[in-house]
Amino acid sequence: ASSSTSIQGFDTSSIQKDDEIAALLPDSVTSDGTLTVGADTSYAPAEFLAEDGKTPVGFDVDLSKAIAAVFGLKEETISSTFDSIIPSVGSKYDLGISSFTVTKERMQAVDFVTYFKAGSTYVVQKGNPNKVDSSNLCGVKVAVQTGTTQEEEVNKANEQCKADGKDAIDIQSSKL
């Protein structure tokens, strides 16, 4: 017999519509009865795909379902690449939820509700045999996700490497 692990999210069925809050939404959001949410489903436990490889799950998905319930709408999370979510809010998506870092540039495009704060870290081979120093990445190959603040930070560090006459950082940007 095989065993299977299933993901169970937060039960939002008891959340009631708040008519006063729902009345604040524009018709462009409410007209189809669905809150359409863009999310990069590669960032567990916040947003990722269930075992079926199709169903978005995670605490951000639970949060978007709760928000939709308060609005009196159905919720649909659509898997997207991280760098395409913010530009698509207001056209393809009613909102984006994907552990965004709030930046001045992003605030020029969309409004944010901050409910979560996380840091960044570098991952190296066990034991750090190449003695990678995160304060000096010049000449090191670094992989980052496209469109993230980490990509911006590594690009900024790379400019400093060049300005200092050091080897460039080999930046490997990917949509993951």
Language-model regions: role of each:
Residues 44-49, 105, 151-152:
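Short, solvent-exposed loop/turn elements at domain surfaces
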Residues 74-136:
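Acidic, polar ligand-binding/catalytic clefts
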Residues 1-2:
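N-terminal Sec signal peptide cleavage junction
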Residues 23-33, 98, 113-118, 142-147:
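Phosphate-binding glycine-rich loops and adjacent basic patches that engage nucleotide phosphates
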Residues 50-51, 109-110, 155-156:
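Short amphipathic alpha-helical segments
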Residues 36-38, 45-48, 76-78, 111, ...:
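Soluble periplasmic/extracytoplasmic beta-strand elements of cell-envelope proteins
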Residues 6-11, 15-96:
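Extracytoplasmic small-molecule ligand-binding "clamshell" domains
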Residues 56-69, 100-102, 119-176:
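Bilobed "Venus flytrap"/periplasmic-binding protein-like clamshell domains
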